[in-house]
A protein has these predicted regions:
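Conserved N-terminal segment of class I S-adenosyl-L-methionine
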Residues: 1-71, 76
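A broadly tuned preference for mixed-charge, low-complexity surface segments
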Residues: 68-80, 127-135
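A short beta-strand submotif of the Rossmann-like class I SAM-dependent methyltransferase core
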Residues: 61, 76-82, 105
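Conserved catalytic-core segments centered on acid/base and nucleophilic motifs
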Residues: 67, 77, 81-86, 92-96
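Short, surface-exposed linear patches
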Residues: 41-46, 56-59, 82, 99-101, ...
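Active-site flanking residues adjacent to catalytic metal/cofactor-binding acidic residues
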Residues: 21-23, 37, 80, 105, ...
Length: 135
């Protein structure tokens, strides 16, 4: 799904029976996610609180660049405000594509990065001609 709309997350087109993985949601996971993967569950340095896991969600400590799941294990993969922190974003995306059939990636806007820069952000990510560009 490609959207430039800041509220695009409200219409992810996740089907009722889809199995959903969310990578790195921290303190704000989507209720619809079935599995939560977080690389640093005990380090709240870059989030606004402790990792939140709803009762119906399974939690796994995992790096988005090396996910412990089989190919196509999920119908949908969500990565919200995480990719800009990745050591190797290309590997991270390869893993998302490997384990999921469809997905959603949201990153901070260029304006947001200029107005509120964060040291923990390794990348500024733009969508140019339907391609993600990292710098």
């Amino acid at each position: 799904m490609i959207t430039r709309h800041p509220l695009g997350r409200q219409d992810l087109r996740i089907k009722r029976r889809d199995k959903v993985l969310e990578i790195g949601p921290g303190h704000d996971p989507m209720f619809r996610s079935d599995v939560i993967a977080d690389k640093f569950p005990h380090d709240d340095t870059h989030r606004c609180g402790k990792v939140l896991i709803y009762p119906h969600q399974q939690f796994i400590e995992a790096d988005g660049e090396q996910l412990p799941f089989e190919k196509d294990a999920f119908d949908y993969v969500i990565c919200n405000q995480v990719l800009e922190h990745a050591d190797n974003p290309a590997r991270f995306i390869e893993e998302m594509v490997r384990v999921g059939k469809r997905g959603y990636v949201e990153t901070p806007s260029m304006l947001g990065e200029q107005m509120f820069p964060k040291e923990s952000h390794r990348w500024v990510i733009l969508l140019i001609e339907d391609k993600l560009v990292f710098y």
